[in-house]
A protein has these predicted regions:
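Core dinuclear metal-dependent hydrolase active-site scaffold
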Residues: 1-7, 131, 135, 141
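Protease-associated
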Residues: 134-144, 152, 158-159
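Rhodanese-like catalytic fold shared by cysteine-dependent sulfurtransferases
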Residues: 20-22, 29, 33, 80-117, ...
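Short, conserved clusters of charged catalytic residues that mark active-site
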Residues: 38-42, 137, 178, 242
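Hydrophobic "anchor" residues on beta-strands that sit immediately upstream
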Residues: 7, 151, 256
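Metallo-beta-lactamase
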Residues: 1-105
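Conserved G/P- and acidic residue-centered "switch" motifs that form tight phosphate/ATP-binding loops
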Residues: 11, 155, 303
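Short, well-ordered beta-to-alpha junction loops that form the rim of enzyme active sites
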Residues: 58-62, 68-69, 114-116, 155-158, ...
Length: 347
């Protein structure tokens, strides 16, 4: 009794990181550097003086775009965070803090300001969102809904299943990767109607996770999943996927074009020597870069983002792509020639 036990640190302190100062709803005269300075003051005067035994419960964890490099753990002691969180170094000056916290910030996802608006003005009850979304549609009804509405067909299966066969022009963003962040980054409007193709039994999970980032307009799902679509005899598409070893052979013997869809810091840190950068979150800006004749290779770090990119390119009518299974990690392990490694913190 009377003893501090825990702190709910919100977006101020994360595990291994602190909140992004560029996301705050700020006055017009305040820069992100000003807000970073205010964050420094809050940490130093409100949180760091607390006892080391206190448990920290942050509002976000690994994978969230609200920070740069959060730990995968969900709770920790404040004492441990004081030891290992770069932003809580005891000898850190305010100027050093501002520089480190604002350095390398990627643009915030497009849905962030839309979510802020929803939080201020209110949003639909989730029971209604789920009732509308958890509507099973036969392949015929699903196809009709896709043709008659402006819905995106979103396939949330595993990437290894998607590449083997999918509904033409559907977009892949798998539940087993960074699902919500990529939905938010790639689908511009939170009011966009969505038709789902999900693994059996995970339809409600998909609708729920979409809703958590403001995408409340799922209008149904394909009953029986992709297998039902295929069994009905409807048109299917595939993504040509090859091993890293075969990709290296194509690069070295045929000088095949390579596109790296990782983010810019990842690419600058180390990349396949002949690869061009085409970050997934800016893919539409690079459409003219992809060759119209001859095959080209697409890879990311491990194979998730490259399949997202491939599905987007195919939906835009670009079909001469080949996905590299396992991504940059497999290319490295298979002996691909790469640029010299540069520590990301020095970029």
């Amino acid at each position: 009794q009377g003893k501090d036990h825990a702190i709910f640190s919100g977006d101020t302190l994360f595990l291994g990181d602190v909140g992004r100062p560029d996301l705050a709803q700020k006055a017009a005269h305040m820069t992100q550097e000003d807000l970073a300075g205010t964050l420094f003051d809050s940490l130093r005067t409100k949180i760091m003086p607390l006892a080391d035994h206190i448990t920290v419960y942050p509002a976000h964890g690994a994978g969230s775009a609200c920070g740069k490099n959060m730990m995968k753990e969900t709770v920790d002691s404040l004492g441990n965070q004081k030891k290992m969180n770069y932003a809580l170094r005891a000898d850190m000056t305010k100027e050093e803090f501002i520089k480190e916290v604002t350095d390398g910030l990627m643009p915030p996802p497009k849905y962030f300001p839309l979510n802020v608006k929803m939080n201020k003005e209110g949003y639909e009850d989730f029971d209604k969102v789920l009732e509308r979304g958890i509507k099973p549609l036969s392949p015929e009804a699903f196809e009709a809904a896709a043709n008659e509405t402006e819905a995106i067909v979103l396939d949330v299966r595993h990437q290894s299943d998607f590449v083997k066969g999918f509904v033409p022009r559907s977009i892949f963003i798998g539940l087993d990767g960074s699902f919500a962040p990529w939905v938010g980054a790639l689908i511009a409007d939170v009011k966009q109607p969505i038709l789902l193709i999900a693994p059996q039994g995970r339809e409600e999970e998909a609708i729920t996770r979409l809703s958590r980032v403001g995408f409340d307009h799922t209008i149904g799902y394909l009953e029986g999943g992709f297998d039902a679509w295929k069994a009905s005899g409807k048109e299917v598409d595939q993504i040509h996927s090859i091993s890293a070893a075969e990709a290296i052979e194509r690069i070295e013997q045929n000088n095949q074009a390579v596109f790296d869809v990782r983010n810019t810091p990842e690419y600058l840190s180390e990349h396949v020597l002949s690869a061009e950068t085409a970050p997934l979150d800016a893919l539409n800006d690079h459409l003219s870069s992809f060759p119209s004749e001859g095959d080209f290779l697409v890879h990311c770090a491990g194979g998730y983002r490259s399949v997202i990119a491939s599905s987007i390119l195919k939906s835009r009518g670009i079909h001469n792509l080949i996905d590299v299974a396992g991504g940059f990690k497999s290319l490295q392990e298979s002996g691909a020639k790469t640029s010299d490694y540069v520590c990301p913190s020095t970029l």
